[in-house]
């Protein structure tokens, strides 16, 4: 039990905003994170095609983790005062380490591209809406976790958890705050995930920019 105490102390600072929760290490300033790479998903082979009954949410044709990585790059690159390793450089560097376990892949990748930290994303739920943006029989539902890992020490220094199933204003009056950004419409799963990614990355940027 005592071994867990140092980790707990590093994660005292936390933030919650509705469907997005994040935590960061209390010594983030001393880490001097300047250059960040995104860990590409491990290649698990072709995804099986699964039949879906009419009117039910269709599973994505793409790997949900690939979808998340694709959304992360523009969100990260759009913000100043940090360096984001390009996707092409990351994929080239990761070709020779794809068979290693995640911790080894992360460390080797970070060292290969001279990154201070590596961002790891995992999509745990990606369910598309049934219907269109003006009338959905079933809303989009997305859940993902982001972890920023210090390459040198190998520990998690920031994490974010996004979990949302879109609700109408009549179901939840608290969604009124997002109407100005999203409008009164039903989002696709991509749009919902992108909204969560931008918010999470924005929180991370405030922390990194603040200590840079």
Which residues make up each language-model segment?
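Sec-dependent bacterial lipoprotein signal peptides
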Residues: 1-15
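Hydrophobic core residues within well-ordered beta-strands of beta-rich domains
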Residues: 117, 140-142
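Second-shell loop/turn segments in exported
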Residues: 54-63, 93-97, 133-134, 182-187
């Amino acid at each position: 039990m005592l071994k867990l105490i140092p980790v707990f102390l590093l994660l005292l600072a936390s933030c919650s905003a509705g469907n997005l929760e994040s935590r960061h290490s209390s010594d983030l300033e001393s880490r001097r994170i300047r250059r960040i790479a995104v860990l590409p998903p491990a290649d698990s082979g072709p995804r099986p095609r699964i039949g879906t009954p009419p009117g039910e949410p269709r599973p994505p044709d793409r790997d949900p983790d690939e979808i998340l990585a694709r959304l992360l790059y523009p969100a990260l690159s759009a913000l100043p005062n940090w360096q984001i390793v390009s996707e092409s450089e990351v994929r080239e560097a990761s070709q020779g380490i794809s068979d290693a376990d995640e911790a080894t892949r992360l460390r080797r990748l970070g060292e290969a591209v001279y990154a201070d930290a590596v961002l790891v994303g995992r999509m745990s739920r990606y369910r598309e809406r049934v219907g269109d943006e003006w009338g959905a029989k079933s809303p989009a539902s997305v859940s993902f976790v982001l972890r920023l890992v210090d390459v040198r020490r190998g520990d998690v220094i920031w994490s974010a958890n996004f979990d949302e199933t879109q609700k109408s204003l009549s179901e939840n009056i608290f969604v009124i705050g997002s109407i100005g950004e999203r409008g009164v419409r039903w989002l696709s799963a991509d749009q919902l995930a992108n909204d969560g990614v931008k918010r999470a990355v924005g929180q991370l940027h405030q922390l990194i920019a603040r200590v840079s």
